[in-house]
């Protein structure tokens, strides 16, 4: 027998992967909810998105037999017959689990075709159904929620036993997710995170605000909450170091200031052995998962017998964390000045083997936004809060490079530190999500990048490849720029061309106007280059010198012609160096072949009738050079430049010269095996193990092209920073290339591109290693979950 009618609240949360029917335009989706063909509600319109997020709730009256229908439409085509339909979800209320219970139910349903139209339909719809008396959460919800797994361990409290969400530990120095993706040669997948085995689902880190589950501990009434302090609740006073707080939905959670973690579960008393074990385990996991804080008891000595240096004072924060005030320089630090500081780098340095606080004070305070910290082994590292990165190098030192490093690298590095420390080059809060298909990366990237404002593109860039669930902590974005640069600079698109038959440097194609949208594409490419510089990524491309000079607004010269057309350059140089009287019959005009049609272009007014003489030949050469390098591609370059300066201010980039700008955009393509080897770390392996020796022997015997492929396989990019492998970037700053013993000899090597790590099984012979490594590098494409 059917139950009577009841009120529920339907939430249309989000849709994921909707069909995109226009090449350069995304739909403006909205949803229409209908109950039994009578009750109708409509969501707002989300502009230009195939992954819309609404999270809108509607009160409806339903019965178990009620038919729920949600239809999605493109608002721009809604009034056009059979064109605006994006998908349909339909089901009966009895199909929704726990209809009779008073709890939330989440649904993810694939979108279906309509019986009245034959349009293709893609994607899923995410819904929530909640009793009307329960207020559904309105936290941040990603359009990919349906693919994530929320951890809901069973927790016993003083009064109730139920399944509750437990937020994972977080700190203010790390936002890394434990969701991992691996690049595995066997399954043709590549990793973007850490992990130990393939095939397990990616975990999703929850927090008190974003977790979607309700909690019994949030049942405190407002009348009781205001009469209790934050250090007690209805069960009594909390243990020392604990605090009770409420999120934006009124749900209670607990903060452990001892370990800087949060939990939905009320902490038990210290006499509870189960809680002690759990707390110890959480502390251990917290220490293993994050960089240690400088408040490590082993490093913070409060013994009054060990006096502070003159002018120093130790104080405490509200949470009891000690910090130190240097009244000499009017600065504060977490680092105890009584502890000797280990030098920042592991190699030789002019700083000395140990840096005492007195020697550091001579360098002056750290730049704005920088902080010095210590690892467990008391090794100093530096945090740049402006760019949210870490480094071993002291930013106050002129250079931490070795003494034999060329001067140009030292100069470039100083400029780079200055360039990246400027406010205009600091990432903005939030994320910029870009989802593309590998086989349509050019078209998808154009649509995604051009729909964002320059402000949004300066947020943290998160790349996602369609059908691959890897989280982007650096490896995916490096792979993205590598693949995209191969596509958008391909001469087949007529946007760029090679400068000469024997030279693979690129220049703007003067005949790009064959594509009526070419100026929009040049603005897009300018944005991509600016985006790569802003987010510290490399493009796998090199341009003619004149293009770098024009980006810096420098005047081009005859010497720049050599990289464009060496034969034409030699001809013009001969004209300047020799008497042309009676030898050459030239006028102030040039001929241009435009798809088989020869056109005459006058360099000056009536130039076709003005003869070039010994007196005016210098002017002729200058005009020809300017036309060949600049004038004939002026429109294209202006569009290209307009996109570039949206991300990178011309006043900032002018600190570099044209050669340094080339390194900033493309890095170094030649792979130095000795430099690679000297800046590699090993886990479980040691440098003298046979497999490691075979590995470097194989790499040394490869061509540079094959080495670049391996580098791209393991790190996501084939380019190297100008300072070599010592400056290789990971997910959170500089991270060395690492080889770890993992897997069995019948498996292929596995790459973790976010962490520059290669999992290498202990192969029995050099031939086996060579075969497996080559197979993995040549045939692995894509990402999967660990």
From Swiss-Prot:
- Which part of the chain is the HECT domain? 453-786
Q: Polar residues composition bias: which ranges?
A: 204-213, 263-285, 295-305
Identify the stretch annotated as signal peptide in this record.
none
The residues annotated as the active site are: 754
Enzyme Commission number(s) from the entry:
2.3.2.26
GO biological process terms on file = intracellular transport; protein ubiquitination; ubiquitin-dependent protein catabolic process
Q: Does the keyword Transferase apply?
A: yes
Q: Identify the GO cellular component terms for this protein.
A: cytoplasm
* GO molecular function list: phospholipid binding; ubiquitin protein ligase activity
Which reaction is this enzyme known to catalyze? S-ubiquitinyl-[E2 ubiquitin-conjugating enzyme]-L-cysteine + [acceptor protein]-L-lysine = [E2 ubiquitin-conjugating enzyme]-L-cysteine + N(6)-ubiquitinyl-[acceptor protein]-L-lysine
Q: Where is the C2 domain?
A: 1-109
Q: Which CDD domains match?
A: C2_Smurf-like (cd08382), HECTc (cd00078), WW (cd00201)
Q: Where is the composition biased (Low complexity)?
A: 142-193, 214-225
Q: Which residues form the WW domain?
A: 236-269, 306-339, 364-397
What SMART domains does this protein's entry cite?
C2, HECTc, WW
Q: Report the InterPro entries cross-referenced here.
A: C2_dom, C2_domain_sf, E3_ub_ligase_SMURF1, E3_ubiq-protein_ligase, HECT_dom, Hect_E3_ubiquitin_ligase, WW_dom, WW_dom_sf
Region described as Disordered: spans on this chain:
134-225, 263-306
Key words, A-Z: Repeat, Transferase, Ubl conjugation pathway
Name the pathway it acts in: Protein modification; protein ubiquitination
Q: What class of enzyme is it?
A: transferase
Tell whether Hydrolase is among the UniProt keywords: no
> What functional role does this protein have?
E3 ubiquitin-protein ligase which accepts ubiquitin from an E2 ubiquitin-conjugating enzyme in the form of a thioester and then directly transfers the ubiquitin to targeted substrates.
Q: What else is known?
A: A cysteine residue is required for ubiquitin-thioester formation.
Protein's name according to its UniProt entry: E3 ubiquitin-protein ligase pub3
Q: What is the lineage of its organism?
A: Eukaryota, Fungi, Dikarya, Ascomycota, Taphrinomycotina
């Amino acid at each position: 027998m059917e139950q009577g009618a009841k009120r529920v609240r339907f939430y249309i949360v989000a849709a994921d992967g909707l069909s995109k029917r226009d090449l350069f335009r995304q739909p403006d989706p909205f949803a229409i909810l209908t109950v039994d063909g009578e009750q109708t509600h409509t969501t707002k319109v989300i502009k230009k998105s195939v992954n819309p997020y609404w999270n809108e709730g509607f009160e409806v009256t339903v019965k178990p037999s009620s038919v729920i229908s949600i239809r999605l439409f493109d608002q721009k085509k809604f009034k056009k017959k059979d064109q605006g339909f994006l998908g349909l979800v339909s089901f009966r209320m009895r199909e929704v689990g726990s209809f009779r219970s008073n709890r939330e139910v989440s649904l993810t349903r694939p979108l279906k075709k309509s019986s009245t139209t034959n349009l293709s339909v893609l994607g899923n719809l995410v819904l929530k159904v909640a009793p009307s008396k329960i207020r559904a959460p309105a936290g941040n919800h990603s359009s990919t929620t349906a693919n994530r797994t929320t951890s809901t361990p069973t927790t016993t409290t003083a009064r109730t036993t139920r399944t509750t969400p437990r937020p994972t530990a977080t700190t203010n120095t790390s936002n890394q997710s434990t969701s991992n993706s691996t690049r595995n040669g066997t399954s043709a997948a590549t990793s973007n995170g850490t992990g130990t085995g393939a095939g397990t689902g990616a975990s999703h880190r929850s927090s008190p605000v974003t977790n979607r589950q309700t909690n019994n501990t949030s049942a405190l009434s407002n009348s009781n909450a205001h009469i209790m302090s934050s250090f007690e609740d209805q069960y009594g006073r909390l243990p020392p170091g604990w605090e009770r707080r409420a999120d934006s939905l009124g749900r209670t959670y607990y903060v452990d200031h001892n370990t800087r973690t949060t939990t939905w579960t009320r902490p038990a008393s210290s006499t509870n052995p189960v809680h002690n074990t759990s707390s110890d385990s959480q502390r251990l996991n917290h220490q293993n998962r994050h960089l240690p804080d400088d408040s490590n008891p082993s490093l913070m000595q409060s013994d009054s017998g060990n006096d502070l240096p003159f002018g120093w004072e130790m104080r405490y924060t509200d949470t009891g964390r000690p910090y130190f005030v240097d009244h000499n320089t009017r600065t504060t630090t977490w680092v105890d000045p009584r502890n000797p500081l280990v030098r920042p780098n592991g190699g030789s340095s002019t700083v000395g083997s140990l840096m005492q606080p007195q020697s550091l004070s001579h360098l002056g305070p750290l730049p704005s936004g920088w902080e010095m910290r210590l690892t467990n082994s008391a090794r100093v590292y530096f945090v740049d809060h402006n760019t949210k990165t870490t480094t071993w190098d002291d930013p106050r030192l002129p250079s931490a490079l070795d003494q034999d490093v060329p001067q140009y690298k030292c100069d470039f590095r100083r400029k780079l530190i200055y360039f990246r420390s400027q406010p205009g080059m600091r990432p903005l809060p939030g994320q910029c999500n870009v989802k593309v298909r590998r086989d349509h990366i050019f078209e998808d990237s154009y649509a995604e990048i051009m729909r964002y404002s320059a402000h949004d593109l300066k947020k943290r860039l998160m790349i996602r490849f369609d059908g691959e669930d890897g989280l982007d902590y650096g490896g995916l974005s490096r792979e993205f720029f590598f693949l995209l640069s191969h596509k958008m600079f391909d001469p087949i698109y007529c946007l760029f061309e090679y400068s000469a038959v024997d030279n693979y440097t690129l220049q703007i194609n003067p005949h790009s106007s064959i594509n009526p949208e070419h100026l929009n594409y040049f603005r897009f490419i300018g944005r991509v280059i600016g985006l790569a510089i802003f987010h510290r990524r490399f493009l796998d491309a090199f341009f003619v010198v004149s293009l770098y000079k024009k980006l810096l607004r420098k005047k081009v010269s005859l010497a720049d012609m050599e990289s464009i057309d060496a034969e034409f350059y030699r001809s013009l140089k001969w004209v300047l160096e020799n008497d042309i009287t009676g030898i050459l019959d030239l006028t102030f005009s040039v001929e241009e072949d435009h798809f088989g049609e020869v056109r005459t272009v006058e360099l000056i007014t009536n130039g076709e009738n003005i003869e070039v003489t010994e007196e005016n030949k210098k002017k002729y050469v200058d005009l020809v050079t300017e036309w060949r390098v600049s004038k004939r591609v002026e429109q294209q370059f202006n569009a290209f430049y307009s996109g570039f300066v949206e991300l990178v201010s011309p006043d900032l980039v002018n600190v570099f010269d044209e050669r340094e700008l080339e390194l900033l955009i493309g890095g170094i393509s030649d792979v130095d095996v000795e430099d690679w080897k000297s800046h590699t770390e090993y886990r479980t392996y040691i440098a003298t193990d046979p497999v490691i020796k075979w590995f470097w022997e194989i790499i040394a015997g490869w061509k540079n092209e094959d080495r670049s492929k391996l580098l791209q396989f393991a790190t996501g990019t084939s380019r190297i920073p100008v300072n070599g492998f010592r400056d290789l970037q990971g997910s959170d700053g500089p991270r060395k290339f690492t080889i770890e013993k993992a897997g069995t000899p019948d498996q292929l090597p596995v790459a973790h591109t976010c962490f520059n790590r290669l999992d290498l099984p202990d192969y029995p012979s050099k031939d086996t290693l060579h075969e497996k490594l080559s197979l993995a590098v040549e045939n692995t494409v894509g990402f999967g979950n660990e």
